[in-house]
């Protein structure tokens, strides 16, 4: 029997089979484009679509976790409205004559790194928010849906990390618990898990491998294992 230590974000015990959730990686390549203004328009259309999607997530979250906790999605909308963020993407498109996906990815890396290097723990967590909104924009540019956890039976989700948008879309009758390799007890994902009453561990000292899928496991949020 293997025992892994993590940080509990919500006490409780869950027993069930593991479901390894691995996000489909967004393959972003740098491509030269000719019509920069058309590419800027592509970005803005994708950004506006992301705004609408976040509005829908906010409405769902209000019902699930209340207005105060749903405010994370309003904050995500504000990040997408941020002029520095938009200017960065548009400037990269115009000056380098590259595709919007690449410009968004570069902007995401820049801003998320900037937040991650801050001393304040709350501000550090905003790095994950920048990555989340950027992934949503890139998914829209590619004509894809942003990843979400889908399962047919009650399971313990095992993931590298979960974004707030993925967490709020979890079906509580299908998720016994979740365990992530990364993440923090101060993250919005952790806050949502507590509010939704889902036993969860984050920053767990283990390696995420596909062969764990289907294994029987016990999550004890009281003793952090």
Question: Each predicted region: which residue ranges?
Answer:
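Non-catalytic, soluble scaffold/interaction modules
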Residues: 1-225
């Amino acid at each position: 029997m293997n025992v892994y230590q993590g940080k509990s974000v919500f006490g409780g015990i869950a027993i069930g089979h593991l479901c390894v959730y691995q996000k489909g990686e967004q393959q972003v390549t740098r491509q030269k484009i000719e019509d920069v203004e058309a590419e800027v328009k592509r970005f803005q259309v994708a950004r506006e679509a992301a705004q609408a999607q976040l509005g829908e997530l906010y409405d769902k979250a209000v019902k699930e976790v209340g207005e105060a906790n749903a405010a994370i999605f309003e904050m995500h909308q504000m990040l997408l409205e941020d002029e520095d963020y938009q200017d960065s993407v548009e400037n990269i498109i115009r000056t380098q004559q590259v595709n919007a996906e690449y410009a968004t990815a570069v902007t995401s890396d820049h801003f998320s790194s900037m937040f991650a290097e801050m001393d304040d723990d709350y501000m550090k967590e905003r790095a994950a928010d920048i990555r989340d909104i950027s992934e949503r924009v890139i998914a829209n540019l590619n004509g894809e849906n942003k990843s979400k956890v889908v399962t047919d039976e009650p399971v313990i989700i095992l993931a590298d990390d979960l974004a707030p948008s993925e967490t709020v879309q979890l079906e509580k009758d299908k998720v016994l618990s979740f365990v992530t390799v990364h993440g923090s007890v101060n993250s919005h994902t952790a806050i949502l898990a507590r509010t939704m009453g889902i036993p969860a561990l984050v920053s767990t000292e283990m390696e995420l491998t596909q062969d764990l899928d289907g294994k029987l496991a016990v999550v004890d949020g009281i003793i952090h294992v």
